[in-house]
Amino acid sequence: MGMWEEASDTGMKGKKKDKNEEEEERGKKERMVNLTLEMIYLLTGEHYIPRKKSDDGGALHAPGSVIQKENNKNDKKILELMSNIIQLLTGEVAIRTHHVSIYFSLDEWDYIKGNKELYEEGIKEEPQQLRPQACEYKDESNVTAHMEATLCCNSDGNFINPENPEISPGEQPPPANGIKEEATSSEEGNQSDCSINPLTEEIQGTDTPTPIMGCSLNYSLSDNYISDEIKEEETSCQGRNQSDCSITPLTEQIQGTDTPTPIMGCSLKDNKYDGNPHWSPKNTLRRKYSCNECHEYLIHKRDFGKHQMTHKREKSFSCSECGKCFLNQLCPDRHQTGKKPFSCSKCGKCFAFLSDLTVHRRIHTGERPFSCSECGKGFTRPNALIIHHRTHTGEKPFSCSECGKCFSKQSSLVHHQRTHIGEKPFCCSECDKCFASSSELNIHQRTHTGEKPFSCSECGKCFTNHSHFAHHQMIHTGEKPFCCSKCGKCFASSSDLTFHRRTHTREKTFSCSECGKCFSNHSHLARHQMIHTGEKPFCCSECGKCFSSSSGLTAHQQRTHMKVKPFSCSACGKCFSNRSHLIRHQMIHTGEKPFSCFECRKCFSNPSNLARHQMTHTGEKPFSCSECGKCFASSSDLTFHHRTHTGEKPFSCSECGKCYSKKSSLVHHQRTHTGEKPFSCSKCDKCFASSSELNIHQRTHTGEKAFSCSECGKCFTNRSQLSRHQMIHTGEKPISCPECEECFVSSSQLTAHQQQAHRMVKPFSCLECGKCFSNRSNFARHQMIHTGEKPFSCSECRKGFSNQSSLARHQMTHTGEKPFSCSECGKRFSNQSHLARHQMIHTGEKPFSCSECAKGFSNQSGLARHQMTHTGEKPFACSECGKCFASSSKLTAHQRTH
């Protein structure tokens, strides 16, 4: 369109020259020009005609005549003309309130007329801002003079709908889609004194707002104001009459520059403006204004004032269902109804607001217009860039009033504050489980649907959420970007690093409200609390067995039903159902024990063993048995103990059918069938079926006796020996015979009693002499008589013994130690059995009687020797002369004759 120029009343000749052009430009364009000329005449009293530029690029100007207009009549006429222009361009109806011009489609206007009460309060919300992204122009002389228009009020201060003057615009309801606004302000003078703003409108079928007159502008809605989808532009008029206002190009100072730039009349090419006060393309941002509420920095005073209003605005519109508050009436309506009128043409996904759809489309196009000046990373939203920028600056402007913890995002603070108040507003419709955030609810709902939308391109494994997927991919890449400043150890995720750092500080910020136990991370606390509640939400679809964690369910399914063990050890070929078990196993080969006790510096291969060990220092036993009140350091120990009351033995051997209460006991038993002894001593190369046996054996080389009795100070190489010893002081005999109810200190004593007194089976028989034994240890000890093996030797005299207890008794002859004393006569003995035998002299007790002659004996060996007089058995033969004897002592005495 040619430039607008003033002309006098005598300039009618120009109109005649343009008749040919007007005939060619019929239709909507001609109508818009005529309506605009008429509107300018009503506003200024001057005639304007369109003319082409002169050859030298100058604009022809002719002074026009000025007339006195009647304001009230003209205002109404201007409203009608403006409405006609808008309808010609967009098919929308415009109304004017006290502060904003708002544009509605014809369908929306029908809705407004039927629901005016709902709109009366909603229209009072503060409008949001639509900003131009950038502006470039070569020559200001090439820029057309800009048409500016503002809908004005009548003399009574009321604004009239041109389609229906009887309806006040202030009574209109909100439209079904986004609202476009154009805000004005007047400081001195009346409404008619306001300057004239460029009219912008979003052309239907496009995504970007376009000015009605002037040039084509590229606008982007600032994501800081997307919630209401309101677009605005501010102007002010400093107390002038409307007739004095000149029609000048509306300028906007683009952030990051120092010169005002015309908004209209040029073609915008640079789309790098992102509305982010922290960033400018040339990194020349001047931070003039700082918000005391959220520490946000802004360049312009006008933007600073607007930003502060976001803190002052009340969210007066609340949802009747959940109580959530919103800034305007439109948001709770969409929130309650779930209406999403804006759909993506690519994937069909729907959105409640047009701005959300605009941002979503960038996923398909790959457009990331907002880039970080530090690292170059791109983002689809400017607020995402602002949040990202804080990772470089370390800024965390949002702090919790309860604990003082700081966050870089407002949403993170809100989510954190729910941990203090316990609020979980998002509930699952399937199982009624509630969550603190909608994202957690969405991830949880996938456990019901089984949806795993994130799949790994390397191994095909699928995940329910993107964070797990990203964490998994680092396994393939080996990337560990998060390093500990204390020890230099690196991790794949920041959460793993945070958890690791607590091993240095020993910080345990999460405590159980039931028992007071503290944990270093929230997931461990949640898992622990299920012990108190008994909750096991993860059930196996095959057998119905329930678990407290999804990892437990997965391990169960792989181990029991699928029997899949995809993780194999490269050293020994052993397979495992999950990676953590493989990593723990590999530490056996490497000898790595990264977890050390702060008290005694003892090291462990996994944190659970360390935690269990630390309870030996603190004496803490938080898990108590409901049957007998006995306390335990771990829940697994309590579970094993419960089985002594119930008699449950869920683990059975496939070879012989023998059952066990613990899986480890079954594994140890199965090695008796396979003969496997994977644990070998580095000193003597002796092999053992379990690591505990190896540890006990290694103490014979080191002489270490780590377990000491608090009563008498006696030391033992393993805990079981100490426990058995302590029963001497306490008199406790927890194992009872079901036949005669006699009590014993250990299960081995009970077994021996049952075999002797109740004629139980003795499955282990000696191939040399045919003697039978009830347990393997006694059988192994007996075989040493035939082989002559004596693996335990005295360090003083080098005398050998077939078992460690005999060696211990012998060593007391060198030390002279006799810790057991008789309460009757004070005589002391080197071992408990000798004391017990001696005490029978005082009591006269002879519990062992001969079945042949009923003679009584105080000990079993005396009875055995006596029975040989009835049978005539003489098992001990002299190797020199072949003479036989009933006892080894007599054989020894005889051998001295040779």
Curated annotation (Swiss-Prot):
Please tell me where this protein is predominantly located: nucleus
What SUPFAM superfamilies is this protein classified in? Answer: beta-beta-alpha zinc fingers (SSF57667)
Entry keyword set? DNA-binding, Metal-binding, Nucleus, Repeat, Transcription, Transcription regulation, Zinc, Zinc-finger
Q: Does the keyword Zinc-finger apply?
A: yes
Q: Name one Pfam family in it.
A: zf-C2H2
The domain of life for this entry's organism is Eukaryota
What biological processes does GO assign it?
regulation of DNA-templated transcription
Question: Is Zinc-finger a UniProt keyword of this protein?
Answer: yes
SMART domains on file: ZnF_C2H2
Q: Name one GO cellular component term.
A: nucleus
**Where is the stretch described as Disordered?**
1-30, 160-211
Bias (Polar residues) ranges: 186-209
- The C2H2-type zinc-finger regions cover 289-311, 342-364, 370-392, 398-420, 426-448, 454-476, 482-504, 510-532, 538-561, 567-589, 595-617, 623-645, 651-673, 679-701, 707-729, 735-758, 764-786, 792-814, 820-842, 848-870, 876-898
Q: Where is it localised?
A: Nucleus
Entry GO MF terms: DNA-binding transcription factor activity, RNA polymerase II-specific; RNA polymerase II cis-regulatory region sequence-specific DNA binding; zinc ion binding
Q: Which family does it belong to?
A: Belongs to the krueppel C2H2-type zinc-finger protein family.
Q: What does this protein do?
A: May be involved in transcriptional regulation.
Name the UniProt record assigns to this protein = Oocyte zinc finger protein XlCOF7.1
Q: Which organism's genome codes for this protein?
A: Xenopus laevis
Organism lineage: Eukaryota, Metazoa, Chordata, Craniata, Vertebrata
